[in-house]
Amino acid sequence: MLCVLAGAAYGVFRTEAALSSQWRAEAVSGVPLTVEVTDMPRSDGRRVQFAAKAVDSGGRTFDLLLSDYKRREWAVGSRWRITARVHPVVGELNLRGLNREAWALSNGVGGVGTVGADRVLLHGGSGWGIAVWRSRISRNWRQADADGGLSDGIGLMRALSVGEQSALRPGLWQAFRPLGLTHLVSISGLHVTMVAVLFAWLAKRLLACSPRLPARPRAWVLAAGCAGALFYALLAGFSVPTQRSVLMLAAFAWAWRRGRLSAWATWWQALAAVLLFDPLAVLGVGTWLSFGLVAALIWACAGRLYEGKRQTAVRGQWAASVLSLVLLGYLFASLPLVSPLVNAVSIPWFSWVLTPLALLGSVVPFAPLQQAGAFLAEYTLRFLVWLADVSPEFAVAAAPLPLLVLAVCAALLLLLPRGLGLRPWAVLLLAGFVSYRPEAVPENEAAVTVWDAGQGLSVLVRTANRHLLFDTGTVAAAQTGIVPSLNAAGVRRLDKLVLSHHDSDHDGGFQAVGKIPNGGIYAGQPEFYEGARHCAEQRWQWDGVDFEFLRPSERKNIDDNGKSCVLRVVAGGAALLVTGDLDTKGEESLVGKYGGNLYSQVLVLGHHGSNTSSSGVFLNAVSPEYAVASSGYANAYKHPTEAVQNRVRAHGIKLLRTDLSGALQFGLGRGGVKAQRLRVYKFYWQKKPFE
């Protein structure tokens, strides 16, 4: 008990230390900073993003992730005097998806910011150092593809050698996810372990050729493996995940230095070493997956002394697949059905062919060698992209905690020897986990979820048997939050997908959401989407709930915002109104055309709470109880604006904001409207929800 209390106290102490080094103030513009670029900048086409050690005017130091939308050059090691808009790391909060606060805390990111127009160079950067070396390697890889014919292959080589994930275009990441291969292109424990094994194997071969063996050959082999792991981790930028991987391997090597040791004892020692070095590792999904899968391998393979290597490999792949069924299903709400088979082939190919070629081409920048590696990488990616297009995914709804615990137990039972007779029960429990469905919405009622889409919009409307999604949010929001949350909500089919208008914060996630089967696409600008129909005035009813597309009177010279679809949903007398980015002129046109029929208890404010929408006349006509502003935390547009907030409150309307509360839920029915946050709890280190 004393050890447990000491460990808990140590974890709290380290967490408080990490929190104290984060930017705690709200968004502040024009902050004078002296920054040193500490890692290779990465570009996504819109901006250049780089990690920097920043010192403010008070002498306080922060590790910031800065963005420059002017896309200027920021040499590694250079120091600058800049002004920036800085704010804490606060991400979206949905049913499932990336937790940016946990990611920032576990990776040592103290805040994010946007660089201003002016900058003064204080120091041009040194010509040596790991970061500079990595930058040169990346440049050498780019120069190896003079004609640009192997751009994707070169990008993969850069990702595998120096950890430059931004070298891969976004479309490739979307291909890796349904195949369950994202872990292969972001340097992690798998890569570091494979390089360690490669170095250890080379050391063993060299020692075998030596006329005189050292006193402790095992120690030399283990030391070579650890040295290889450290070398690769440094080459990849020595990020926090790679640091943990090196430490884990060092712990394994230390445990094995004197001969055979219990696999479980080694596992526990490695886990203790990682948590002692960095207690915040528990916030990273990778830690749970890494140690969980290794534990599954030990559980399945330990004690089977008489099996051949092939049988052991098959059993190991089976164990990893079974436990992944539970872990991936719960964490990501999705199961790539072809993942076990694809991983069985891809892991050896990436580990023993592509990664060694990437390392060799980095150390020996010989153009033909680099081009050969890039050629293999290019056609590997082309095959995987094709495979991703034809590979299905299985959505897994968010199961309650007791069912999750039972599913983990079932996975372990399934890995036990056949003679125990427990496998049929394990299969039944796992089937219950993957087929779980949340409680259905009652007839004549509607459940509305306004997802936390950052500076975007996405609204899910559910009835007893139907689902409608209004807008998809941005590309990033859809991939990291909305699609996983739709899966977790049990949405396997969208009966209607509505795209209010052609704007990246409303339809940017169309490609990601579009992979979910749908019964039809309706849009304010249907010409931009294949097979889409216009959201002209029409009414329909699902499960006793009335839906209606409203349309302003015809106007001339309407911009894209003015073409937004307008949706009204009525269930048992309670109503929801969503207007996309409709401006005040469009709102006034709706008032003139529909008058009091616009009355709705829940109004999603137009244009995220911009001054261009939510006029007083419109608020009077709608007369809502709740007004929802779907906007990003500390967004550059300051949505919802002070003017809109004051106008809403002056009408006696309760304002709810996704940037402060995360995703919001509303129940519409005969009892009126029930409103609540989707996530009502938070850990003590979390900022969001603020309210």
Curated annotation (Swiss-Prot):
Its main location: membrane. One of its GO terms (biological process) is establishment of competence for transformation. It is found in: Cell inner membrane. Pfam families: Competence (PF03772), Lactamase_B (PF00753). It is a multi-pass membrane protein. The keyword Magnesium does not apply. The chain crosses the membrane at residues 183-203, 220-240, 280-300, 322-342, 347-367, 396-416. Keywords: Cell inner membrane, Cell membrane, Competence, Membrane, Transmembrane, Transmembrane helix, Transport. It comes from the Bacteria. InterPro entries: ComA-like_MBL, ComEC_N, Competence_ComEC/Rec2, Competence_DNA_uptake, Metallo-B-lactamas, RibonucZ/Hydroxyglut_hydro. Essential for natural transformation. Could be a transporter involved in DNA uptake. To B.subtilis ComEC, H.influenzae REC2, and E.coli YcaI. This is Competence protein ComA. It comes from Neisseria gonorrhoeae.
